[in-house]
Amino acid sequence: MSMACTKVWRSTMYTPRRLKRTTPASRVSSTAMAAANGDASHGANGGIQIQSKEMKTAIHSNDSPKTLLKSESLHEYMLNTMVYPRENEFMRELRLITSEHTYGFMSSPPEEGQLLSLLLNLTGAKNTIEVGVFTGCSVLATALAIPDDGKVVAIDVSREYFDLGLPVIKKAGVAHKVDFREGAAMPILDNLLANEENEGKFDFAFVDADKGNYGEYHERLLRLVRAGGVLAYDNTLWGGSVALEDDSVLEEFDQDIRRSIVAFNAKIAGDPRVEAVQLPVSDGITLCRRLV
């Protein structure tokens, strides 16, 4: 098999396997579905590998950690040294529940939740927005970090998966901080903007939803988040595939997402309204501070 493999890119990214989808994508009702789908494995040497021209690769699955680190042992070291020992008991409970789910790979990994919590505390955020919720791991991280009178407006096209995590959020004593809104994100954001009092009301926004709409979400969130506030966008390196010159080796699903992410990255890179940084945490996270 190794003789048939063609290495098309070498870097700190997943080494995906041939796709083995058993559930139609249409059955995944959460907006977080667009974050990932497929069957991937993490290779020691990094890079996307394909077995033949007929075999397509997929970026994410439950079979591999959502990380861009080339070394799995290094990722484990980081988790065991800095993440798990400091993990809130309710965050751990929800993480373990989510990991057993068929689409558990769509969840924000614990190191990303830790980063979000730190950012929220550093910025003193009180009112936040989250687009794309899934089981609520990042919502819980946010609710635990913001003050008792803070709010996270959590938006997802379906509450099916959120209901899996809601009992843990309630047990953590932070359910009163969560304002879950079911439906497509665009009209919900537009409805928020219809009330002028919401412009500049929010301190922080986190987006982990349909990648094709990231640019549109950005325009709306720039009006909802105050000057000096932070906007965070997940999956902006998409398994490292953004660096591919030829994405024909990818599943069509991943090709579409890759192209959307590449366009979004270019948009942020040239946006004078924000100060931005892209970090290789998890699957890539882009942080923007609104300047004007």
Curated annotation (Swiss-Prot):
Positions that bind a divalent metal cation: D208, D234, N235
Record GO terms (molecular function): metal ion binding; O-methyltransferase activity; S-adenosylmethionine-dependent methyltransferase activity
Keywords: Magnesium, Metal-binding, Methyltransferase, S-adenosyl-L-methionine, Transferase
Cofactors (names): Mg(2+); Mn(2+)
Biological-process GO terms, alphabetical: methylation
InterPro entries (alphabetical): Cation-dep_OMT, SAM-dependent_MTases_sf, SAM_O-MeTrfase
Effect of D234L: Total loss of activity
Tissue localization of expression: Expressed in stems only.
Listed PANTHER family: O-METHYLTRANSFERASE-RELATED, TRICIN SYNTHASE 2
Task performed by this protein: Catalyzes the stepwise methylation of tricetin to its 3'-mono- and 3',5'-dimethyl ethers. No 3',4',5'-trimethylated ester derivatives are produced. Can use caffeoyl CoA, 5-hydroxyferulic acid, luteolin, tricetin, quercetin, myrcetin and 7,8-dihydroxyflavone as substrates, but not naringenin, apigenin or kaempferol. The 2,3-double bond and the O-dihydroxyl group of the substrate are both required for catalytic activity of the enzyme.
Name of the protein described by the UniProt record: Tricin synthase 2
Organism annotation: Oryza sativa subsp. japonica (Rice)
GN (gene name): ROMT-17
